[in-house]
From Swiss-Prot:
Gene3D superfamilies on file: Ribosomal protein S20
Name used for this protein in its record: Small ribosomal subunit protein bS20
HAMAP family for the chain: Ribosomal_bS20
Keyword terms of this UniProt record: Ribonucleoprotein, Ribosomal protein, RNA-binding, rRNA-binding
Record keyword RNA-binding present: yes
Keyword Plastid annotated: no
Naturally occurring in which organism (per UniProt): Polynucleobacter asymbioticus (strain DSM 18221 / CIP 109841 / QLW-P1DMWA-1)
SUPFAM superfamilies per UniProt: Ribosomal protein S20
Family: Belongs to the bacterial ribosomal protein bS20 family.
UniProt GO molecular function: small ribosomal subunit rRNA binding; structural constituent of ribosome
InterPro entries, sorted: Ribosomal_bS20 (IPR002583), Ribosomal_bS20_sf (IPR036510)
């Protein structure tokens, strides 16, 4: 239990930040699912459009260190490869 006023405040801030970060991670997972769904439908143009928006989301979350930069890079790479493989 937090004993000082500063520790109590930091505990409150940690809870608030955790909720915010959780919502951003959820947004990231939702956008990745949207790209995968677009890939499954077979519409390459739509998949590329959704991927562009998802790529921006992934970058923002990696910049805020909510997701590791290597994880973000791997996700973008795999989604991009899946879109490129649609033509083949």
């Amino acid at each position: 239990m937090a004993n000082t006023a500063q520790a109590r405040k930091r505990a409150r801030q940690a809870v608030k930040q955790n909720e915010h970060n959780s919502s951003l991670r959820s947004k990231l997972r939702t956008s990745i699912k949207a790209v995968r769904k677009a890939i499954e439908t077979g519409d390459k143009a739509a998949a590329a459009k959704v991927f562009a928006a998802t790529q921006a989301t992934i970058d923002k979350i990696a910049d805020k260190k909510i997701a590791h930069k290597n994880t973000a890079s791997r996700q973008k790479s795999r989604l991009s490869a899946a879109i490129k493989a649609m033509a083949a």
